[in-house]
Amino acid sequence: METVISFTAIAVAIMIGLAALGTGIGFAILGGKFLEASARQPELAPALQTKMFIVAGLLDAISMIAVGVALFFVFANPFLGQLAG
């Protein structure tokens, strides 16, 4: 049982870490491309900014889903029920 708990803790750490890494890389690429596009065509900056914030919200949602799944595994681990039963 301790093995399942330790592997779950490692999996949760990997999930949260990769979600944070992916979100950080995504925001960096998104911000860089937004600044590049705004520098090329400044008149499109307001429209691009709206689209950038929508995509930023989707990027942030992906990491929040990963945190939710990780918290599910921490507090309501479904694998422990299979060991007990």
Swiss-Prot record:
Segments passing through the bilayer: 10-30, 53-73
Keywords: ATP synthesis, Cell inner membrane, Cell membrane, CF(0), Hydrogen ion transport, Ion transport, Lipid-binding, Membrane, Transmembrane, Transmembrane helix, Transport
UniProt xrefs under CDD domains: ATP-synt_Fo_c_ATPE
Transport found in the keyword field: yes
SUPFAM superfamilies: F1F0 ATP synthase subunit C
Pfam family name, one: ATP-synt_C
CC terms in the record's Gene Ontology section: plasma membrane; proton-transporting ATP synthase complex; proton-transporting two-sector ATPase complex, proton-transporting domain
Similarity remark: Belongs to the ATPase C chain family.
Function recorded in the entry: F(1)F(0) ATP synthase produces ATP from ADP in the presence of a proton or sodium gradient. F-type ATPases consist of two structural domains, F(1) containing the extramembraneous catalytic core and F(0) containing the membrane proton channel, linked together by a central stalk and a peripheral stalk. During catalysis, ATP synthesis in the catalytic domain of F(1) is coupled via a rotary mechanism of the central stalk subunits to proton translocation. Key component of the F(0) channel; it plays a direct role in translocation across the membrane. A homomeric c-ring of between 10-14 subunits forms the central stalk rotor element with the F(1) delta and epsilon subunits.
Name of the protein: ATP synthase subunit c
Gene: atpE
